[in-house]
Amino acid sequence: MTRELEGRVALVTGAGRNIGAAIARDLAAGGAAVVVNARSNAAEAGAVAEAIRAGGGRAAVALGDVADPAAAEAMVRAATDAFGRLDILVNNAAIRREVAFEEMDFAAWRAVLDVCLDGAFHVTRAALAALKASGSATIVNIGGLTGHTGAPHRAHVVTAKAGLAGLTRALAHDLAGSGITVNLVAPGMIDTARGPGGSATPHAPGHRAGRRTLVGREGTAEEVAAAVRFLCGPGARYVTGQSIHVNGGAFLGG
């Protein structure tokens, strides 16, 4: 396995479990030093960091709520204090709740947007100076299939994920002269309970949420992480402003 990210430093938000943890581990496998963020669960974040160190990598933990601008600044400082620079930002922190729109109050709406959309704004703003100093930095926002297709009972999540796609394109323009590429990965139909290779038993199209995967199975967190790692590597320096769908073709299904 190549270590194409050797010498790079990454901050991954919401990295204590599931897709975020898989991203942190894969970036570390590529040679990056990784700062593992979680809102408050030190045990989960610490376990991810320890697994990275056990594999010969470098890792640090930075707890903090991305919805808090001061916490966002603190986690960026933790990265630069620990490793001296910041080259990669993965905005993965999210909360996903289902509620019918007619039952959704503003507090529920705001809670999701505060983390999923505003959180990406806060951390990106806090990281901008360090990323510009890198000279060849990367921002990867983790969106979602529903941000492009819509879904019932998730108006707040759909809106936040669609907003992330828009933010990605806007930042690709705004940061074009600074050596920073900005892309989005849109996972869908991911079974975080399974490892590489997806479901052991292929499912029929239309298995979940009324939406099929063309490859006949659910994906894994590791497959999402592989797309993120590619976008952070030297082979993707000509890629910016893009949404990469990691959903087995579900984006094309119906």
Predicted regions and their residues:
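Residue(s) in the substrate-gating loop at a strand-loop-helix junction
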Residues: 144
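Substrate-binding pocket helix/loop in short-chain dehydrogenase/reductase
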Residues: 100-101, 108-113, 209
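Alpha-helical segment proximal to the catalytic Tyr-Lys
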Residues: 129, 173-174, 237
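Active-site helix of classical SDR
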Residues: 124, 160, 168
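Conserved glycine-rich cofactor-binding loop
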Residues: 9, 16-18
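Short, small/polar-rich loop/turn modules that mediate ligand/substrate recognition or access, typified
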Residues: 176, 181, 239-241
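Short C-terminal tail/terminal secondary-structure segment
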Residues: 149, 189, 229, 240-254
